Amino acid sequence: KANKVLIVDNKQLNAEQKEFVKTYFDNEVRHDIIPLMIENLPQLPYLRDKSLYLAIVMGNKTDAYQQKFALIEVPSRSVGRFIILPSKAGFTTIMLLEDLIEFNLPIIFSHFKFNQFDAHVFKITKDAEIDLDQEVGLNFIDKISKGIKNRRKGKPVRFVYEKDMNPEMLEFLIKKLGLNRKSSIIPGGHIHNFRHFMDFPNVIKEPNYNRPRPFIHPAFKKKMMVFDLIMQKDIMLHFPYHAYDPVIDMLREAAMDDTVISIKITAYRLASNSKVINALINAARNGKKVTVFLELKARFDEEANLEWKTIMEEEGITVLVGIPNMKVHAKLCVIQKKVKNKLVQYGFISTGNLNEKTAKIYADHCLMTKNVTLMNEANRIFNYLGNWEQGDKPIVKMRNLLISPINMRSAFMDLIEKEIQIAKKGYVASITVKLNSLTDTILLDALYKAVKAGVKVNLIIRGILTLKRTNEKNAGKINAISIVDQYLEHARVIIFN
């Protein structure tokens, strides 16, 4: 309201807006609406995981016994959830797609001659785990493929509904979904799927509310090849404050560079029309040896990654997939080229996905480097990924890179203990931890011990944090916060001072 932006439902429309909503529905939405008549079905049809649905009870005011049940999936993916309506000067009025559909229910169901419509929103969450141990006779790719298909049939584990839903409809849905645990049935408000608000129209005009455009890192303002810049010095990029272009440019340059021999890179989540993959395909076409470790177990990206695997292999790229009981979440790139008959390695170590779209909203760091030790160790990781059956010898004795589950926790424990000893000697000691989540009880116990010894501990945790409250005297205090702002905090940084 302070910015004159109003979100209205179908009961708050003026005459002009009502006409607009009817026309918009007819032109933009109607062809995506598929009503499901459900009251006589032995079981519910396939319902998408986490999609919004309208549960509709239709009847006549004159006949309380004549009613029908229907479901409509809200087509947020194809239409978009936020519709800007005509407004008076200086105001912006927005209507949610589910409310626009509810307004047009008399048109959708006109042939039933009903005059009373009761519609409420709900969504289900299905069991999304892919059990890779079940099908012993299948290879890894077949297991992933079968798991994706089985996910469609996954049992609902959570049912969130608008708390004013018609009681008969609510009872009907709970029974048909096979839900019997109260903890799985959650009443809520009118608005669900708040993640869609990441795509809320940018209608606020004040400059303070507009995201700044990513700016070019000063090093890249020089009209030089990315390789030449990295040869001069390491470059740390901070997304989304810095533009993601240098990462794409580095791969594109390598694809066209006659002296480049190979490109090795890991991939977890990719953009739908990935410029990264396009650059790698171009490199393969130009005769470079391109190796991509593609994590097929990236939750909800399994299907997309399987498609990318097929595309890349058809272009001659070597695609490595899957280590049992492990996800490869590292973001690494090693490029090898010949410079004056000497092998030179350069690339990057990053916290972000190889995704130029999410790089605009995820706060991440990327170190572009030619550092011999780091690149040698990164290359050893790729050697392990390609030959993991032969054991982890190549990566056990790393000196600089910390790798989970090999040496990361033990290294952190040693560093925490070092801060404890410094604090015990009366010096200032501190640890700052910035992570997506922190649930490792062994590390948390070490941090409790550190704080008792006088180490100042600051935690910046975006998601889950299993920190215990303590009433012990002289136990010290761990300062823990979560940053919620314009960007999604995605970086992993730990500072021992």
What function would you assign to each model-found segment?
Residues 456-460:
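Hydrophobic alpha/beta core scaffold segments
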